[in-house]
Amino acid sequence: MTKLEKANSYQEQNRIDGNEKPVFHITPPVGWMNDPNGFSIYQGKVHLFYQYYPYSDVWGTIYWGHCISEDFIKWKELPIALAPDENYDAAGCFSGSAIETKEGHVLLYTGVMENEKENGTKTVIQQQCLAIGDGICYEKVKDNPVVPAELLPSGFSKEDFRDPKIWKEDENYYMVAGNKNEQSNGQVVLFESQDLKNWKYLSVLIDNQGKYGKMWECPDFFSLGEKHVLVVSPMHMQADGQEFHNGNQSIAIIGEYDKKNYHLLDEQMISLDYGTDFYAPQTLQTEDGRRVMIAWMQSWDMNIKPLAQKWNGMMTIPRQLEIRDDILYQNPVKELEQYRTEPVILEEKEISGTCMIPGIHGRVLDLTLELLDGDYETFTIYFAKNKKYFVSFRYVRATQSIEFDRTYSGMIRDVVCQRTMKLKKTEKTLKLRLILDKFSVELFVNDGVQTFTSTFYTSLTAEDIVLECDKTALINIEKYKIELDGSKD
């Protein structure tokens, strides 16, 4: 039995019951999940691969898990796509991407192999490798690695050269990957190929100028509206005021692409999410032209899942990206709306003190609150609540900020529980859209100007939702339960 066959057999024999897991967020069948990989359209269906270690709920020698969807919301688990079974990827099949070609579904990933230096020091070499398949089964090409580390200019790190993102443009294929320069600062390198197997180095698309963390992971480069966007995840990034508190952060650099010199002229850099659990996002372009992003809904530094839980890791809900008036907006894909049931819609509801509203409770919800007017100074929403537990968002009017608190969510270890997000764009009204799915919350502020993503593993018996206002607030409320066929919250 091959390594891949053994892993697939283990996955089938140890698959975890779906009722123990979120309803519409991707989780591993069993074991560990991290970065999304190969987010792509193939033969009209959405494919998502992911960093996967089925044998434990902690990170190990990485495989590629695989799932498929027709609408971004209902996902079907497929057999494991890649195993670390060759010399060039024996230490792991690290992150990468996918593209549809005439030859089939092409996966471009980082193969990690152990290496011993002349002085006996053990290290690794990271190189880019190719596999081609039919949407279910994939075969690695005999020419691997197709982008060997030797193609990098002198002084560029061969140990940190990973996470290729591929696209096709003007009949050629292009790839960006994360790398380190001679000063050990992060940079994104750009390569070109005509046939996917023979690649040449073009340029440093952009580097971090010693400002934005160290190694840059999981780059993704695309046009959006009239701009170009580089999504990247810097490691060891310093906090700046109320920005960049995760250490391992995800940012977007927006600017103009100098195609002649293969260089991104950056105009603005923004945090992609202000929560505790968001990393390594990747995007695709849909057949109707939308740019959709998904990310790992967890953090390397804040693993809080219960000890008895045999799966570890989730993905965010896929989000549509748009740039309007130089602002990057993120919102849940529209496909979520077809699964909304049991509506509760209230207009100009007056909230004073603490209250629970009939029909508004549960842990699998799409809930929007729009604060219209009032003399209040603070407005708080508590969710996943009972007499013992709660998670909350509090809007503080004087500071134009939102405070998150999961201190009382029932965690078993001491991690970051509180965080404050300063509002970037203030409006006459404040709109808060919460997507809840058992063990996570994704907050979209003012139609997606800012987002805040966090996990919590509170007992599912805690399902109350409580609104609290220090004085009086006039609000609109729109609540839906999210229900897939046969799902249970």
What are these regions (language model features)?
Residues 5-12, 250-489:
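Beta-rich accessory regions
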